[in-house]
């Protein structure tokens, strides 16, 4: 019976490379010279420090550009509100989102059931498993899942016949 898994994960080496490239460009850019700007990653938490809101916004846009260049979907970043830090700087804490949450999984399942395809979808922790008799139904489900906007990038793995 053909099946596939739906997952959402982050490639940490690629994310770290994008972060390093972003920091290198920040160090070279003229409009950031002499300013204390930092981006740090500890596990799934990214802390950005900038002197003001405008610079913080520029750093976030720059990080997103570098993520796209390294083929990491920028939707993996869940950006929180900014807060005042020591001195006159502003700190923003972001979180890397991995795995498909229960409510997103239920949303995907209801959308697939609306298509009335002969497939079964099961929630397995933070991923989904879809099984069906026809390969065409599974491929149609894959295209429908990519069309659903859940705010996370999804990948299809373990496609088996």
From Swiss-Prot:
SUPFAM superfamilies given for it?
YajQ-like
| GO cellular component term of the entry, any | cytosol
Tell me the superkingdom of the source: Bacteria
Cite the entry's keywords alphabetically: Nucleotide-binding
- Keyword flag Nucleotide-binding: yes
Q: Answer whether the UniProt record assigns the keyword Nucleotide-binding to this protein.
A: yes
Q: Name one GO molecular function term.
A: nucleotide binding
Q: Name one Pfam family in it.
A: DUF520
Q: List the disulfide bonds.
A: none
InterPro entries in alphabetical order: DUF520, UPF0234-like_C, UPF0234_N, YajQ-like_sf
Which PANTHER family does the annotation name?
UPF0234 PROTEIN YAJQ (PTHR30476:SF0)
Family per UniProt? Belongs to the YajQ family.
Its annotated function is as follows: Nucleotide-binding protein.
- Report the protein name in the record: Nucleotide-binding protein SAR11_0692
What species was this sequence derived from?
Answer: Pelagibacter ubique (strain HTCC1062)
